[in-house]
């Protein structure tokens, strides 16, 4: 039914698009550090014919005297103003100046999300990420782009590869260099590009640990960082148990691999890791696909500290919360839930289902006979997939080798209709 409704709305929108659109639109013009001189003719015409222009002080200062429209600086917080932008001047278009490509971690994407593509027109400039790749000699399609404008520094930590990192301000390079050094990646090649594309462009390079120990005092607020990360031995799809800080409460590597397969991560999805222990499932989930995030629920405060430390060590976005289901309230809605502990707590599974959207997935692992019996009951009610895993390790037995069995794991996975 929902799909039919969406098609109907789309068809209606297509029909409306054939008629002249007289309602005001938001025109977002990307501008670089070279100011008006670097703009195409269509962008210059838009700005010169504007009736009102919004932007940050730095972006508005890039406009020249040929732009005569009133200029309005973004307040802080900015979102309430964005939500009512068209209320300001309903008889004419609203113009916005933004850095580089407004659709790359920029305000253009936010405005389209708020108003839809029919009411937002974007005239992009060359992005700072593309300019940085050009200076470094890197192919853009082989380079990850990470934004730290509104994200914690550790989310730009990687175990190998390369990335262009969008900075929040002048303090970002030193903070990222310190994070890399603190997680054993001090030899990462670290390049800071300031005022890129403008007359004051400056590029400085060095190992991350040198930047962390003695960061320059004159870094420009307008900077971007190119990092070739120091690789390490843990670059596979499933990390060894020793890569995590843990107290023994960890989903072992072999079971973690089959659990990730059952969870089936997709780009941008959010996981709830319930009974997280060391956070190994949450960490592996976030590493598995671009944009994946996780919320880890764990009762023990020391384990919560370990989860946070593991997230920082692997540069992933894991929000750590307390006991489940008490701390479910206020957490972002999950796409997928994994239950690795606490299965026999009264009402836990029901609470998990209550927070999953239609099409959401749940995977639960059981070690004890009691929790296994619970999964069998749920399988009889909702079907899904019920599996049991038993693996063995080869160990010395006298002068020979014997097989030592590990504890069997029962796993139930189901998708909501």
For each of these PLM feature ranges, what is it?
Residues 278-290:
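Conserved SAM-binding loop of SAM-dependent methyltransferases across substrates and taxa
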Residues 299, 304, 319-394:
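S-adenosylmethionine
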Residues 268-277:
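Conserved class I S-adenosyl-L-methionine
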Residues 34-35, 99-161, 326, 335, ...:
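Class I SAM-dependent methyltransferase SAM-binding "motif I" and its flanking Rossmann-like core
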Residues 1-123, 130, 152-153, 291-294, ...:
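Class I S-adenosyl-L-methionine
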Residues 252-267:
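Conserved alpha-helix/loop element of class I SAM-dependent methyltransferases that forms part
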Residues 269, 292, 360:
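Glycine-centered, small-residue-biased loops immediately flanking beta-strands
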Residues 2-28, 41-42, 92-94, 162-249, ...:
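A contiguous loop/helix-start segment that scaffolds small-molecule binding in enzyme catalytic cores
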């Amino acid at each position: 039914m929902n799909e039919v409704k969406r098609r109907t709305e789309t068809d209606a929108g297509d029909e409306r698009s054939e008629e002249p659109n007289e309602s005001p639109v938001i025109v977002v013009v990307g501008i670089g550090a070279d100011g008006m001189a670097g703009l195409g003719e269509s962008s210059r015409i838009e700005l010169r014919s504007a009736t009102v222009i919004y932007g940050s002080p730095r972006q508005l200062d890039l406009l020249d005297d040929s732009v005569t429209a009133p200029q309005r600086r973004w307040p802080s917080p900015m979102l309430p103003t964005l939500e009512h932008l068209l209320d300001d001047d309903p008889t004419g278009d609203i113009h916005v100046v933004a850095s580089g490509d407004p659709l790359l971690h920029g305000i253009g994407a936010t405005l389209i999300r708020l108003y839809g593509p029919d009411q937002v027109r974007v005239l992009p400039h060359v992005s700072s990420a593309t300019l940085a790749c050009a200076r470094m000699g890197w192919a853009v399609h082989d380079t990850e782009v990470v934004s730290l404008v509104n994200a914690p520094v550790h989310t730009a930590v990687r175990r190998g590869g390369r990335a262009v990192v969008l900075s929040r301000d002048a303090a970002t390079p030193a903070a990222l260099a310190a994070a890399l050094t603190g997680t054993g990646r001090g030899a990462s090649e670290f390049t800071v590009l300031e005022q890129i594309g403008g007359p004051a462009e400056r590029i400085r390079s060095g190992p991350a640990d040198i930047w962390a120990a003695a960061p320059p005092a004159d870094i420009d607020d307008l900077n971007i960082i190119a990092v070739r990360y120091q690789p390490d031995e843990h670059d596979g799809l499933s990390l060894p148990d020793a890569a995590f800080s843990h107290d023994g409460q960890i989903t072992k590597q072999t079971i973690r691999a089959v659990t990730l397969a059952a969870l089936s991560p997709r780009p941008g999805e959010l996981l709830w890791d319930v009974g997280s222990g060391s956070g190994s499932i949450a960490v592996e989930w976030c590493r598995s696909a671009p944009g994946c995030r996780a919320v880890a629920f764990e009762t023990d405060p020391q384990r919560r500290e370990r989860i946070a430390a593991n997230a920082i060590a692997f540069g992933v976005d894991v929000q750590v919360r307390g006991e489940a289901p008490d701390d479910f309230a206020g957490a972002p809605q999950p796409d997928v839930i994994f239950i690795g502990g606490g299965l026999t707590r009264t009402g836990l599974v029901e609470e998990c289902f209550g927070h999953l959207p239609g099409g959401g997935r749940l995977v639960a692992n059981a070690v004890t006979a009691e929790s296994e019996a619970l999964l069998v009951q749920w399988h009889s009610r909702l079907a899904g997939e019920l599996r049991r895993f038993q693996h063995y390790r080869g160990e010395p037995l006298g002068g020979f080798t014997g097989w030592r069995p590990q504890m069997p794991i029962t796993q139930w996975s189901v998708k909501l209709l």
